[in-house]
């Protein structure tokens, strides 16, 4: 069973970039089969030409890089957690999660606005900069 819901263009592109990263990083054949199946089910959603412009593809590439950075940060944090090492590096890694997620949200919003997405995700956080 699967559920069909409306989501923003940026959300679909975000999900696809994460699935691409998982496909590159995960070797387990059962997990990989699930990842590829999910990816294939989402690809038709970004098939329209409006989502395939150079500008949108560049934003999607940036989004993938940000998501890859998040993957690396999370891996590093989990190693520190496993070692019970809550030093300055751990704190910087933890802080970098929300800095990097802010970049991610910005890119998703740019994609949504540039594609005319009917749905646009909004964030509401205190300004910390």
Question: Over which residues does each language-model region extend?
Answer:
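Extended, charge-rich alpha-helical interface modules
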Residues: 1-129
């Amino acid at each position: 069973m699967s559920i069909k819901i409306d989501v923003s263009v940026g959300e679909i592109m975000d999900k696809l970039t994460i699935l691409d990263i998982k496909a590159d990083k995960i070797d387990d054949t059962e997990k990989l089969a699930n990842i590829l199946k999910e990816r294939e089910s989402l690809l038709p959603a970004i098939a329209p030409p409006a989502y395939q412009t150079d500008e949108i593809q560049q934003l999607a590439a940036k989004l993938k890089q940000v998501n890859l950075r998040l993957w690396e940060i999370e891996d590093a944090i989990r190693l520190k957690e496993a070692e019970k090492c809550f030093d300055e590096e751990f704190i910087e890694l933890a802080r970098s999660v929300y800095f990097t997620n802010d970049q991610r949200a910005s890119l998703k919003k740019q994609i949504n606005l540039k594609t005319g997405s009917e749905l646009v995700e909004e964030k509401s956080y205190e300004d910390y900069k």
